[in-house]
Amino acid sequence: MDKSKVSTAVGGETPVGLITGSRDDELESGSMRTAETVLRLVPMAFCISALVLMLKNSQTNDFGTLSYSDLGAFRYLVHANGICAGYSLLSAIIVAMPRPSTMSRAWTFFFLDQVLTYVILAAAAVSVEALYLARKGDIAITWSAACVSFGGFCHKAITSAVITFIVVVCYALLSLVSSYKLFSRYGAPDVSYPGKGIEVAAFHS
């Protein structure tokens, strides 16, 4: 019998098939790495846009001057977007490096993605609350409707908050990706049948 046929029958795959499979795996991992890198760079652009827009948000008229720094919610939004922009750039560089992913690295990305998702979500939420008070006012806490006198300021703040919510969506997607990459490393649990000595996988990937 031909040796190539024997190897095919015994091993199930020829050497050519193994080489082709490994190349396909490399191409797939490379495309996944590129996609994740782009996904991590996209929120950085939005973070910088929201940050710069809010930093330049100031209006002066006959009623006085109103700046983003006068409101703690907007200061937090600036800081949160700055932190997320830096993390997005750093994580994109790390992901783009062609190195094998370890369990500790997967856990680190999972943890940081989750934390920063909630950080930027909180920034967007408190900014919306501040904008609501600025537009509607609150007599109980003697908060006047500032948007009546500072309409331009409020419009820029709304735009920055909307962009921040887009960042939240991006980070939610990143959290899903890092969760999948982490928990897909764990094998399926085995189900044992007592007395029969048979173990089967509960599910297959």
Curated annotation (Swiss-Prot):
GO terms for cellular component: plasma membrane. It is a multi-pass membrane protein. It is found in: Cell membrane. Residues 1-25 are annotated as: Disordered. Residues 1-34, 98-105, 178-205 are cytoplasmic. The chain crosses the membrane at residues 35-55, 77-97, 106-126, 157-177. Keywords: Cell membrane, Membrane, Transmembrane, Transmembrane helix. Residues 56-76, 127-156 are extracellular. Pfam families: CASP_dom (PF04535). Coiled coil: none annotated. Belongs to the Casparian strip membrane proteins (CASP) family. Homodimer and heterodimers. This is CASP-like protein 2A1. It comes from Ricinus communis. The lineage of its organism: Eukaryota, Viridiplantae, Streptophyta, Embryophyta, Tracheophyta.
